[in-house]
A protein has these predicted regions:
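Key DNA-contact positions within bacterial/archaeal DNA-binding proteins
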Residues: 40
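Basic amphipathic alpha-helical segments that dock to polyanions
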Residues: 45-50
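Short amphipathic alpha-helical interface segments
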Residues: 10-22
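A short alpha-helical element within helix-turn-helix/winged-helix DNA-binding domains
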Residues: 29-36
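Beta-hairpin "wing" of winged helix-turn-helix
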Residues: 54-62, 66-67
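C-terminal regulatory/oligomerization modules of transcriptional regulators
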Residues: 94-146
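Conserved segment of winged-helix/HTH DNA-binding domains
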Residues: 71-96, 109, 115-116
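Residue cluster at the C-terminal edge of the helix-turn-helix DNA-binding motif
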Residues: 51-54, 82
């Protein structure tokens, strides 16, 4: 499976926004410091996230970004798709005339990987930023008890 840093970092940055601000804009510098993602990379990601109406921006000394919707309404798949990330587990595409190995037939495990891709997409479609936040809260409270 291939999910590049672009998709992972976009989800991390959006989760950071969801966790650390409710109404006040958050600067990319703040996100960069907390998440360890370069500002230049965040600028590229947030350009696409804003274009896809997942965040709103404001300029000025107290400017930054806020989520355009509540965290429970932002699906992880929409974040990943917004930054042009495709989740692929097979080389070939269904609409392609050539199959997995460049021949006219699919490889023997094609359906396995194709089904896995469908499950991964379904997972990201069924989970929101809220799910990330609540899982983090549960995990951190477990660590405190130990």
């Amino acid at each position: 499976m291939k999910l590049t840093s672009r998709g992972r970092y976009a989800v991390m940055a959006m989760a950071d926004l969801a966790k650390n601000n409710v109404k006040e804009p958050t600067s990319l510098t703040e996100i960069s410091l907390r998440q360890g993602i370069s500002i230049a990379y965040l600028e590229q990601l947030f350009l696409k996230l804003r274009k896809n109406n997942l965040v709103q921006s404001s300029r000025g000394p107290s400017g930054g970004y806020v989520l355009s919707k509540p965290p429970g309404e932002i699906k992880l798949l929409s974040i990943i798709s917004a930054v042009d990330e495709k989740i692929k587990t097979v080389k070939c595409r269904k609409e392609s005339k050539k199959a997995c190995n460049g021949k006219s037939i699919k490889c023997i495990t094609h359906n396995l990987w194709d089904d896995l891709e469908a499950h991964i997409n379904e997972f990201f479609e069924n989970n929101t930023l809220n799910d990330i936040l609540f899982k983090e809260v549960r995990n951190s409270s477990k660590e405190l008890k130990q």
